[in-house]
């Protein structure tokens, strides 16, 4: 069995024609690297702080502000923000953010600078302490662009999957830092099967990390050195609930699926999804201020909010088009 973090190839595709067709669809939407973590995209936005028509086309993450008031979607042309039922452009540079992830008080990202910014391309690892208005370089600029990047909400632990060696990582694979990139450690990744498609870090324990592949969802409790299979089947998105007990996993097995898994006990609950046609969940996020509120974004560029723990979902974007809506009771059910 190939180790996905040691340069091995992914496992065989499913015999199901439905799954093969779906992966062909995903591959058409994926970025040039072939990772499924990027949604092909364009953002058409008004001026910062003003209501605007928004068309979503590369969505490279999904995260709330620390106060829970704003939902951010990063892309090739800066950050789009959903606040009080309205879409707008978030203040800050129009960088091409990749691997965007949030902690309690910070944003972390990789990607490419906006044209004319004069910054080195690619970013390596960058950090924002002010909601994306300004960014600090944390190293590896001009060397690495991390499409798979995840952070620990309360710890600021950063895990990345790099495709090639760089000045701080002697080999490709899974690496992590606990001090904002001053020192990186290599994770062995034993037990992983298949090509990585998603990455998640426990909110409080930096040693607990999950990796999704086409062959399953894999969990490590020793900082990525060894993994055990937590769930079978392709995993397109992974996200640790802020309660630290549950892990969200999205896939497609004849239909789009979303599960909330007790990663210690192993029990799983299927979460009902809104109607999705030839689509699946690509990102999951939880509001840190109102923890029954979740957001999902899909590969076909739709986005939904739930304020009841995933029982019902209200659309805030449909197939790339932002939907401005009045705040209040949710209007759509699965």
Language-model features and meaning:
Residues 59-60, 95-101, 144-151, 194-200, ...:
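Repeated scaffold domains used in trafficking and secretory/extracellular systems
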Residues 65-67, 102-104, 151-155, 203-205, ...:
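Residue-level detector of Asp-centered blade-edge/turn motifs that repeat once per structural unit
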Residues 90-116, 120-123:
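Blade-loop segments of beta-propeller domains
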């Amino acid at each position: 069995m190939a180790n996905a973090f040691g340069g091995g190839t992914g496992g065989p595709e499913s015999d199901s024609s439905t799954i093969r067709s779906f992966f062909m669809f995903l591959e058409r939407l994926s970025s040039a690297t072939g990772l499924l973590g990027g949604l092909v995209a364009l953002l058409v936005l008004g001026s910062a702080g003003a209501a605007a028509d928004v068309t979503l086309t590369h969505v490279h993450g999904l995260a709330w502000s620390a106060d829970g008031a704003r939902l951010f979607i990063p892309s090739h042309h800066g950050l789009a923000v959903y606040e009080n039922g309205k879409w707008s452009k978030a203040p800050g540079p129009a960088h091409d953010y990749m691997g965007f992830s949030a902690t309690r008080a910070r944003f972390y990202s990789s990607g490419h600078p906006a044209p004319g910014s004069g910054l080195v391309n690619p970013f390596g690892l960058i950090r924002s302490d002010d909601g994306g208005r300004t960014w600090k370089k944390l190293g590896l600029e001009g060397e690495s662009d991390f499409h798979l990047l995840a952070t620990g909400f309360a710890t600021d632990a950063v895990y990345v999957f790099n495709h090639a060696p760089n000045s701080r990582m002697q080999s490709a694979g899974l690496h992590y830092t606990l001090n904002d990139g001053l020192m990186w450690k290599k994770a062995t990744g034993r037990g992983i099967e298949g090509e990585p498609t998603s990455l998640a870090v426990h909110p409080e324990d930096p040693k607990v990390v999950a990796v999704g592949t086409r062959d399953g969802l894999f969990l490590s409790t020793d900082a990525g050195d060894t993994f055990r299979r937590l769930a079978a089947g392709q995993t397109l998105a992974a996200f640790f609930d802020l309660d630290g007990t549950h892990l969200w996993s999205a896939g497609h097995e004849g239909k789009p699926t979303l599960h909330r898994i007790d990663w210690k006990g192993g029990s799983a609950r299927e979460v009902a999804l809104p109607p999705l046609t030839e689509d699946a969940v690509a990102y999951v996020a939880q509001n840190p201020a109102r923890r029954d509120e979740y957001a999902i974004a899909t590969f076909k560029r739709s986005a939904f909010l739930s304020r009841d723990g995933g029982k019902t979902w209200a659309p805030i974007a449909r197939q790339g088009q932002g939907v401005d809506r009045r705040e209040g009771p949710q209007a759509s059910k699965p």
